[in-house]
Regions:
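DNA polymerase processivity clamps
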Residues: 3-124, 143-252
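Long, charge-dense
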Residues: 122, 127-144
């Protein structure tokens, strides 16, 4: 006989029901800043791509979606899910009760509450796949050989974006020298007299490079990252504690 928890999840799978975890909801909120629409594909990998096609994000989630479905306004969809996502204290410990998505129709999803929200349901209609198709890249990205590799802590990027706002600087520069030393700089590559905010980073580099990306293109989930930079004008940002990656283009 299966333990109660395993049986519960088996029943969810058999009835095409998915519990959407709080963590997945938070990552989807980040994805909504990259593209307001999304196409969920059958399985446990969620992808999105920016409208300008200069940033791709992919998340390997615990949920296993039973079908493809498109959401035109992802922020609206997530705001609706917040109605069913509550924190409840049990024996002094705060636990989240999360919404159950029931996929029994090709046109809409039925959302069920649990815990305090157990008596509530919602019906949310999918968008046409033709509308949201461009919001979900089908092919995986093959990253070329990296020319710089390093890690950053959560505070590192926060400091850089804060400096960019304070000094009104649009660019993030990755610099390396022949000795393999790496520096991240916030600057304006079009203005040689601009203010510069820099941080030396421990890592490895294959040579001397000076590669740029737009600060506005860095829309990532909070946390630490392992970063790869390629002279082929692409970067990979791999989250340290979540199965989450971003591929962000560098400027030519």
């Amino acid at each position: 006989m299966l333990p109660k928890l395993e049986l519960h999840h088996l029943q969810l799978i058999m009835t095409n029901k998915v519990i959407l975890k709080k963590e997945t909801q938070e990552i989807l909120k980040n994805f909504a800043t990259i593209n307001s629409s999304i196409l969920f594909r059958k399985g446990n990998k969620i992808k999105t791509i920016s409208v300008g096609e200069n940033a791709v994000a992919e998340y390997g989630c615990d949920e296993d979606f039973p079908q493809d479905f498109g959401i035109y306004d992802l922020t609206q969809f997530l705001n609706g899910l917040d109605l069913f996502t509550n924190d409840e204290k049990r024996k002094g410990v705060t636990e989240w009760t999360e919404p159950v998505l029931e996929f029994s129709n090709q046109s809409f999803v039925t959302i069920h509450g649990q815990g305090k929200a157990a008596g509530y349901t919602a019906r949310y209609f999918f968008s046409s796949p033709e509308i949201t198709l461009k919001a979900a890249p089908e092919k995986d990205i093959t990253f070329p050989d990296s020319d710089m590799e390093f890690s950053i802590k959560p505070d590192d990027l926060a400091s850089m974006t804060k400096a960019a706002s304070a000094y009104k600087l649009p660019d993030l520069c990755f610099k390396s020298d022949e000795a393999g030393s790496i520096t991240m700089e916030v600057c304006d590559r079009e203005d040689p007299t601009c203010n510069v905010y820099a941080q030396k980073i421990k890592g490895h580099a294959s040579g001397s490079y000076e590669l740029y990306m737009k600060i506005d293109n860095i829309k990532i989930f909070a946390g630490g990252y392992d970063i790869k930079v390629s002279k082929n004008l692409i970067t990979e940002w791999k989250h340290k504690s979540v199965n989450l990656k971003y591929y962000i283009a560098l400027e030519p």
